[in-house]
Amino acid sequence: MRIAFLGTPAFAVAALDALERAGHALVTVVAQPDRPAGRGQALREPATKAWARARGVPVLQPEKVRDGTLAAALRALAPDALVVAAYGRILGKDLLTLAPHGALNVHGSLLPRWRGAAPIQWAVAEGERETGVTIMQMDEGLDTGDVLLQRALEIGEDDTSETLAPRLAALGGEALVEALRLLEAGALVPVRQDAAQATLARILEKEDGRIAWTRPARRISDRLRGFTPWPGAFTTLEGRTLKVLEARPGADVATPAGEPGEAEVVPGRGLAVACGGGSALLVTRVQLEGRPAQSALDLANGLRRKRFRLGT
């Protein structure tokens, strides 16, 4: 097939690799514009743009996608289908309907669960044990189109959104190629989503990473895993931000007496922090504002205290 591909970050590159291996003709790659990144705020090109440039595939980076200009440019390339993977923009009807096979989306969840911009992060943060990828026929709603094909994937107890994303991306590439094969053969049966089962994976905000110690330790641990690497998990210690980098539910450690947020040294292991429901979180690695990352024990040694309160 002649494919016009719309995608921006590293997650989308696995789909490009799969399309290339399957012999599909990529007529263009559409990515978001280069953006400032890093401490120096130098312009950084999207991962998909780098992939395309290395192979001589034409790249488009429009600032606007709903003024008709992009639709006209793609229509001139006569693609058989649009493939969208983490592009990061909402597409209008003119784009969704310009190709004979419409627009197919590679989405990082088992729709209708986790519609929206951060499906991988929220699936982990909410403690789910299974997720997957969906190949969807796009419509004008937010991930509301008919499901064409799905593949499931287990979420491991130690998975973070960062470790899970590459596996989902690879699975998405495989599912995409299979869906295109079935589409060409006329063997795909679109399935309407059950809106009653939908959950929203809204865009993450910095404040989502703030730890509420009144939550059970398992819930705090899940959110730490889901929000790694951003926004991470953080609390405060005597008015300074304290990032919690590594932690797990401390089923085998005593819960410190007192209110949620009370922290106590567990010799040789880390800090046990009292959480909701009488549970404890064993914190092993942290970063105090203005300091490099360190073990939780080193933090306590530096403070010369065995017990202190977090969230203050």
Curated annotation (Swiss-Prot):
<protein>
    <recommendedName>
        <fullName>Methionyl-tRNA formyltransferase</fullName>
        <ecNumber>2.1.2.9</ecNumber>
    </recommendedName>
</protein>
<dbReference type="InterPro" id="IPR005793">
    <property type="entry name" value="Formyl_trans_C"/>
</dbReference>
<dbReference type="Pfam" id="PF00551">
    <property type="entry name" value="Formyl_trans_N"/>
</dbReference>
<dbReference type="InterPro" id="IPR041711">
    <property type="entry name" value="Met-tRNA-FMT_N"/>
</dbReference>
<dbReference type="InterPro" id="IPR001555">
    <property type="entry name" value="GART_AS"/>
</dbReference>
<dbReference type="InterPro" id="IPR044135">
    <property type="entry name" value="Met-tRNA-FMT_C"/>
</dbReference>
<dbReference type="GO" id="GO:0005829">
    <property type="term" value="C:cytosol"/>
</dbReference>
<keyword id="KW-0648">Protein biosynthesis</keyword>
<dbReference type="InterPro" id="IPR037022">
    <property type="entry name" value="Formyl_trans_C_sf"/>
</dbReference>
<dbReference type="InterPro" id="IPR036477">
    <property type="entry name" value="Formyl_transf_N_sf"/>
</dbReference>
<dbReference type="InterPro" id="IPR002376">
    <property type="entry name" value="Formyl_transf_N"/>
</dbReference>
<comment type="function">
    <text>Attaches a formyl group to the free amino group of methionyl-tRNA(fMet). The formyl group appears to play a dual role in the initiator identity of N-formylmethionyl-tRNA by promoting its recognition by IF2 and preventing the misappropriation of this tRNA by the elongation apparatus.</text>
</comment>
<keyword id="KW-0808">Transferase</keyword>
<feature type="binding site">
    <location>
        <begin position="109"/>
        <end position="112"/>
    </location>
    <ligand>
        <name>(6S)-5,6,7,8-tetrahydrofolate</name>
    </ligand>
</feature>
<dbReference type="InterPro" id="IPR005794">
    <property type="entry name" value="Fmt"/>
</dbReference>
<comment type="similarity">
    <text>Belongs to the Fmt family.</text>
</comment>
<dbReference type="Pfam" id="PF02911">
    <property type="entry name" value="Formyl_trans_C"/>
</dbReference>
<dbReference type="GO" id="GO:0004479">
    <property type="term" value="F:methionyl-tRNA formyltransferase activity"/>
</dbReference>
<dbReference type="InterPro" id="IPR011034">
    <property type="entry name" value="Formyl_transferase-like_C_sf"/>
</dbReference>
